[in-house]
């Protein structure tokens, strides 16, 4: 996070901060919640770090949280000396400063609800053509649960907008999996 400048609105600040911390640009950010508990600054170590980083006295902190669904293959800017931005698997997230673990928990809840109403958003995270295994893995990551392979294939069969291709994987050591693609036209027709 960072401070909001006087000459920018919240969305502009969120894009600027994302770029400063990660190097990512042209990302669709969604504002999902404000965090302003009076106890956010109860740990003196957090306050000390923040005052040093911001070079000003801190009495109260309000966070307007944003998130985005971004393909993990997007490279993060490694040239940023002050920040060690990296992709981290959800189970590997350790204790964070302030209430940032709560913010992540709330973000996960928001993403799950968002995906329920906008299932097409998941397909933006997959390659143009993908396997059932790749789609199942994505569902498992989002919903933090395991899906039976056969039942998941049945689930895919019910998704008219997930179109099987004649093409299969090449050069794999296991049985080649069929590719699928997301058909936005069919999806939009069904969703009306």
PLM region spans:
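Short helix-to-loop capping/linker segments positioned immediately adjacent to catalytic or ligand/cofactor-binding
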Residues: 53-55, 73-76, 118-126
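Active-site-adjacent beta-strand/loop module that shapes the phosphate/pyrophosphate-binding cleft
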Residues: 39-74, 181-185
């Amino acid at each position: 996070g960072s401070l909001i400048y006087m000459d920018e609105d919240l969305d502009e600040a969120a894009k600027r901060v994302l770029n400063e911390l990660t190097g990512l640009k042209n990302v669709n950010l969604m504002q999902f919640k404000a965090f302003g508990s009076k106890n956010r600054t109860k740990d003196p170590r957090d306050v000390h770090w923040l005052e040093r980083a911001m070079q000003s006295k801190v009495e109260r902190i309000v966070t307007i949280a944003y998130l985005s669904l971004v393909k993990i293959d997007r490279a993060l800017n490694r040239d940023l000396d002050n920040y060690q931005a990296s992709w981290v698997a959800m189970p590997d997230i350790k204790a964070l400063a302030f209430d940032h673990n709560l913010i992540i928990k709330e973000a996960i809840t928001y993403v799950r609800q968002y995906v329920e109403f906008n299932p097409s958003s998941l397909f933006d995270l997959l390659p143009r053509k993908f396997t059932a295994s790749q789609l199942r893995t994505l569902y498992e990551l989002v919903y933090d649960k395991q899906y039976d392979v056969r039942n998941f294939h049945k689930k895919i069969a019910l998704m008219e907008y997930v179109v099987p291709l004649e093409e299969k994987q090449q050069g794999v050591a296991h049985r080649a999996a069929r590719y699928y693609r997301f058909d936005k036209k069919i999806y939009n027709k069904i969703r009306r």
